[in-house]
């Protein structure tokens, strides 16, 4: 009888462990948040989620998909949560819930053009075609600028079209734009758009309030840790001092 009870306990323990798998959706085309390197997903979000998962006892199972498909996949329960450098905009909050922000520094959005163009500032692009990622906040920035947004599955496609002068500009998050400007020829930055949107957060189904709170509480716990500061310094070195100042301000 004792053997049977022991076996049952082992089975239950195994099932309990299996239930701790957390399927996380991301879009690995947004360096330095998440991107592919030697066919492996790396980046700030990837390491942070693994750190959060370790703290909470979850085994993270990654699902890479298109950015505009992330929230629908979450709502359809194909994944459990989303981390993808995503801001908790009012429009998105109608569909899903968010953790507290996990990035604590101000950012902007680069306006990038072909280096042969004569555009000098964002106002020069009124009525012009601007490439943006489908489902991103940059689409609204283009509209607010009086420009015509052209939607792409990812920013790489948009920037390739910009190189070939098929569009007039691309608007992309500053931290990601910086990476493309290092490696892609024939493009240049002419302006920056600042916004008052919240920093990046993790998305959850509205019915998963307990899970969202778990992650929010753990973000609060980790944000002052050496591990967190190390990640910021690794992936956002230019924002490190700003990050430390922001932490002191928000204590």
Describe the role of every protein-language-model region.
Residues 19-86:
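Extracytoplasmic small-molecule ligand-binding "clamshell" domains
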Residues 72, 86-95, 141, 168-196:
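A ligand-binding cleft/hinge motif common to bilobed small-molecule-binding domains
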Residues 28, 104-113, 178-220, 238-251:
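Periplasmic-binding protein-like
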Residues 46-55, 116-119, 123-124, 129, ...:
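Extended ligand-binding regions for polar small-molecule ligands
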Residues 58, 87-88, 100-148:
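A conserved helix-loop-strand patch within extracytoplasmic ligand-binding domains
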Residues 61-74, 134-135, 150-164, 196-198:
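Short helix-initiation/N-cap motifs at beta->coil->alpha
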Residues 25-30, 63-68, 77-89, 115, ...:
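Beta->alpha turn/N-cap motifs
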